[in-house]
Amino acid sequence: MRGSFALAGIAVLGCAAAVAAQDPGMSVRPFDMKHGGSPNVHMLAHVVTHKGAWKLADVEMEQDPGRPYVYACGFTNFDVQIYDVKDPSHPKMVYSWTIENPELHRGIGAMDGKYFKIGSRYYYAQSYQFMQGTPDADLGAVIFDVTGLPDPSKVKVVARIRYPKAPGGFHNTFAYKHSDGRVLYFATVNEGHALVYDLDKVVSGADSSTWLIGEVPNPTPFKAFGTASYHDFYVGYDAATHQDKFYGAGLGGYSVWDVTKPEAPKQLFTITGLGLDIAHTFTPSPDGKYAVTETEYQYTPLKIWDLTDGQDGKTQNIDTPISGWTADWRDLSHNHEVRWPYVFVSAYEDGLQIFDLKNPLAPKTDGHYYTCECTHEHGFGGTPDNGWESTISVEQGAFGVDVRNYDGLIALSDMRTGLWLFRMDGFKGWNGHAVGMPNISSVQDYDHGPDGAPKPATSPGMGRQ
């Protein structure tokens, strides 16, 4: 990682003052002492999900009180596991599924998962990534009907989304309840755009040629490596402008699009500048005024941006963050969930980290819990032939994080150690209205649509009947 992205590291040094990263002169915890957590973060359960060196990629929690299910993406194990966490101190695996003939497959496997609801039925989409020359190189996602949980006999595969034009599968995805009533599935692909699928068409048995309804171009490709694709994105409703907006991390920078008509996206503005190579994750605040971004290389902090001038149409590009945050300047934070003013971070070797943006100019750490307990810089890299292990990578440990809005339960997936469940003192759930914000987050209201959106003129689909 260091050698490949040395030039990007130099670029970050040039903007260190602007992002106000943790002072490298500050005392940091020795790597062999990263155990346990802060007094306000309580570990409820830990499940070692697999026997091998690599356990999980992402994690997803259902949000309805009557459905206490957590989905763990099995990464290079090529499987998905579903846990009943009705008693969060004693998770119970109720279902697992592995790709057929796993021994014939090569790749990073089961990466990202999203649950969604259409009509009265619940579904789960598991994304996959397999190498060319092996089975299912064109497979993007497997869709399960999970309405009948916790009975495993009632879980059924109902569709598979394939994209043979660009083999390699879907690295990241986002399920979104659009303001027009449709449930859409945004997916990364090895091309210069994100794909947009109509999930009702996918699960209802419609002709597969009708599933794909739109593409969101990537205006910020990673030119140094010839990479045109998005890495990740967030989609949310802007209650002030009555627009559905797409926030894309395009590896060479970030972009915001109006996807109110997903068949014809309109670019609004970009974030580009020094130190933004490998632009990885882009998450706005509920009102779209601020955003948290991640760039995927060692020593870089999460950056905080004021998006106001871009959202108001005063500029086409923003190039200077207003602050930054890091758990440990020697490492790298990964994915994050915003529940304003809190940001919940899956911080690779630094486990679960929680900071707040009560003052966006001065982010403050609120709690942590170390989950990796791993050897520093022996993270993910290489190929299947060397067990995917590197001696220069910090990409190991906490991979994904999710927050259950109705009660504040925190789920975290760790690449090395498996599934973890937590609670934080004083955080008993989240509703944007309680903090003076729209009730907008990555959590979707599949029954009513986005907070603040007019009722759609047409009824949404009913799913598979």
Mark where each language-model region is.
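Feature marking well-ordered beta-strand scaffolds used for ligand recognition
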Residues: 21-465
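Bacterial N-terminal signal peptides that target proteins for export
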Residues: 1-8
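N-terminal signal peptide c-region/cleavage motif recognized by signal peptidases
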Residues: 15-16
